[in-house]
Amino acid sequence: MLYNSPVHLFNARMSKSVCLFNREDLAKVYLPVGQMLQIDRVLSIEGPEIHAEMDLVGHWVFPLHFPNDPVFPGCLLIEAAGQLVAIWGWHAQLKGNPRMAKVSANFLRPIIPEQGVITLKSKIQIKRHVVRGNVQVFAGGELAAEIEPVIVIVKE
């Protein structure tokens, strides 16, 4: 269920989030959990825009993905972008379960652990139960990827 948590603090009538959401907060709502939760913090939600971060330092993927040449995998960037759009949908009080229906991605440069933090910024468009994000992914202060996830909110 989408809104089964007492920490659900989103309010669609507000122009901005009342607080920051950290990994612990996000794990209490309907999202992937454990290692598959890619978003570490939501910094702001204002109208159709959402801004979040994920930490690279100590991320579980680096020892496993090209251990001697660690590069953050594009599939996890796509997952993070989908989670970002789903979080915005919850903020807008869309009821149902989010499902990634389609995605396009353009990877511009590799992301490595020394860059410290990945920043995700998105502008959202919504039409009925379909939510589309235009997500820009920054690492080391530079644009690293552009991802366009399309999330369908499936009614319960």
Where are the language model's segments positioned?
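Flexible, low-complexity linker/boundary loops enriched in proline and small hydrophobic residues
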Residues: 2-43, 50, 151
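Hydrophobic beta-strand-centered segment that forms part of the acyl-chain substrate-binding groove
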Residues: 11-12, 17-20, 84-119, 124-126, ...
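Catalytic strand-loop segment that frames the active site of acyl-thioester-processing enzymes
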Residues: 33-72
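Intrinsic-disorder/low-complexity, polar/charged segments enriched in Ser/Thr/Lys/Arg/Asp/Glu/Gln
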Residues: 37, 47-51, 117-119, 130-132, ...
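Compact, glycine-rich, soluble single-domain proteins
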Residues: 64-86
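Flexible glycine-rich active-site/ligand-binding loops centered on an Asp-His dyad
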Residues: 72, 142-156
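Core beta-strand residues in small-molecule sensory/regulatory alpha/beta domains
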Residues: 136-138
